[in-house]
Swiss-Prot record:
InterPro entries (alphabetical): BcsE
A Gene Ontology BP annotation from the UniProt entry: cellulose biosynthetic process
Cleaved signal peptide residues: none
Pfam family, any one: CBP_BcsE
Entry function: Required for cellulose biosynthesis. Binds bis-(3'-5') cyclic diguanylic acid (c-di-GMP).
Name by which UniProt lists this protein: Cyclic di-GMP binding protein BcsE
């Protein structure tokens, strides 16, 4: 008869804690101390005659395991693994060499951040290999993973439903923990998309009393989880609205949603990356029924920022120019919609999309051509929206090297070069209708006073054709910037106000002839 093991959380019903042989369960825990405690309580929850093996990574088992004589199996096979990826690869072979794995429960306590430097492909391959191994030997395998960013491992594992019998996370919420079950298969059936409150204290892990009778919502399509700033001080508009003070609280509430509307607020450019991670996590983990909306409270989003948020999984980005009534109309317009765009598994890929050109300022002629060509041929970027290239010819009497000294790009990805008596600029992700505004920020003087002629390319095929022509220019016709002045410039009684230097005269008293005598 096959054995059925149990997870070490008291009062859980069988459907979400039983682990029969032949399956693999993966449990993410965001704090290592909680992972160790749950590891020990799971050992203690097994029957006296159970066959259990404890695998500790990066530590000695005797330093981790803490059991009394009244709980747990009579015998526990102990194993230790070095904190190296190679140890995880060889774990299956090493276990077979040490014992007969049939009807065993293997509990692996991973070292903190053990999977951090292992890519998603290798992680999924290891899970699939472990699943085949557990099915062949008729044993159960529980992996407890602790990491600062458990979503990094959770997201790629969501597609491993054929290999994992269970996938869940335990996240610390101040005085309690959330037991977030993506799915959990047992001998009693399978349960999915459950969020349970659990407590951890000196008595161990147990289901919170109010969670024992709480009913999981079947549909939250009418629910709206919003940042309080979105309503601009107005109270909740109906019983379906729930307001939160921070985006972090909105994100944590959205983790339990299925089809609700999630409203984030953004006030400054520095929030972009974190907000993008929140949106990406919700979209990958909670599905396509969520309506995720970002409202810009103050003008802070560039075109690249908006594209990053939409690529991360946002359904809509509401600009700061939209009034509250217009904002509510836009929120209503996305109801009953399903998100259909493809979202990459790795958020780092999206960051690469938004900043593909990590250069700024002057580049040599050949380096400029190579950089622009790489951007244009990047298939991950949207077509005909990669940027604008403009060639400027100086006005009569002005050398192109002198015009270069006036060119001061501030954005990463804006580069320029000089050659063939032209100043050529490439402004990444700049729209053609914003070109004049961008040039006014780059040059301190009107471009009409500095340059006599300009040519603009904004479509991919146009820019690529011009790059081919530019690569044919002989190096002898490449211009070089003016040499920097050498020596120390000693400015007396002068201050810089951020734009130019200003000298302050020193007072000198004139003397008369009588005083000189």
């Amino acid at each position: 008869m096959d054995n059925v093991f149990t997870l070490g959380i008291s009062s859980l019903w069988d459907e979400v804690c039983h682990m029969p042989v032949g399956g693999v369960w993966w449990l993410n825990v965001d704090r290592y101390a909680d992972a160790v405690s749950l590891f020990n309580q799971t050992l203690a929850a097994q029957a006296k005659n159970s066959h259990v093996a404890a695998l500790v990574m990066g530590n000695k088992p005797k330093d981790i395991i803490s059991l009394d004589h009244t709980h747990g199996p009579d015998n526990i096979a102990l194993f230790t693994l070095p904190n190296r990826p190679q140890a995880l690869e060889e774990i299956h072979r090493d276990l077979v060499c040490s014992l007969e794995p049939g009807n065993y429960l293997f509990i692996l306590l991973c070292a903190e951040n053990a999977w951090q430097n292992i890519n998603n492909e290798k992680l999924c391959a290891w899970v699939e290999k472990t699943s085949r191994w557990a099915q062949y030997h008729r044993c159960a395998f529980l992996a407890i993973n602790s990491a600062q960013d458990i979503d990094r491992q959770l997201t790629p594992l969501l597609r491993e439903y054929r290999s994992l019998s269970g996938l869940a996370s335990i996240r610390y919420q101040g005085d309690r923990h959330i037991f977030d079950i993506a799915w959990w298969g047992s001998d009693k059936g399978i349960s999915a998309q459950q969020q349970l409150m659990v407590q951890h204290d000196d008595a161990g892990w147990r289901l919170a009393q109010d969670a024992e009778t709480s009913v999981q919502p079947r549909s939250d399509e009418k629910a709206i989880l919003s940042h309080v700033r979105v309503l601009e001080g107005a109270p909740p508009l109906s019983e379906y609205w729930t307001l939160f003070d921070t985006n972090d609280e909105v994100f944590n509430a959205g983790r339990t949603a299925q089809a609700a509307t999630i409203l984030f607020s953004i006030t400054q450019n520095t929030q972009i990356e974190q907000l993008g991670r929140y949106i990406h996590t919700l979209r990958r983990q909670r599905g396509t029924a969520l309506k995720i909306i970002v409202r810009e409270q103050t003008p802070s989003l560039r075109a690249t920022d908006e594209r990053l948020l939409l690529s991360s999984g946002a359904s809509l980005v509401i600009p700061s120019s939209a009034s509250l009534s217009r904002c509510l109309t836009l929120i209503e317009s996305v109801q009953n919609q399903k998100f259909s765009r493809h979202i990459p598994e790795d958020f780092a890929t999206l960051l690469t999309w938004s900043q593909p050109l990590k250069l700024r300022g002057y580049q040599k002629w050949d380096a400029f051509c190579e950089a622009v060509h790489n951007v244009m041929t990047n298939t991950l970027l949207p077509p005909d929206s990669k940027g604008v290239m403009v060639a400027l010819r100086p006005a009569p009497g002005l050398r192109v090297e002198q015009a270069l000294t006036l060119c001061k790009p501030n954005r990463m990805g804006d580069i320029m070069t000089i050659g063939n008596n032209r100043l050529v600029l490439f402004l990444s992700f700049c729209r053609i209708n914003d070109l004049d505004t961008a040039l006014n920020h780059i040059f301190p003087l009107p471009t009409g006073d500095i340059f006599s002629n300009r040519m603009v390319w904004f479509e991919d095929k146009q820019i690529l054709s011009e790059i081919v022509i530019m690569r044919g220019v002989e190096p002898a016709r490449w211009n070089t910037p003016l040499p920097l002045s050498v020596g120390k410039n000693e400015t007396i009684n002068a201050t810089h106000d951020g734009r130019h230097w200003r000298r302050y005269p020193e007072p000198h008293r004139l003397t008369t002839r009588e005083e000189q005598a």
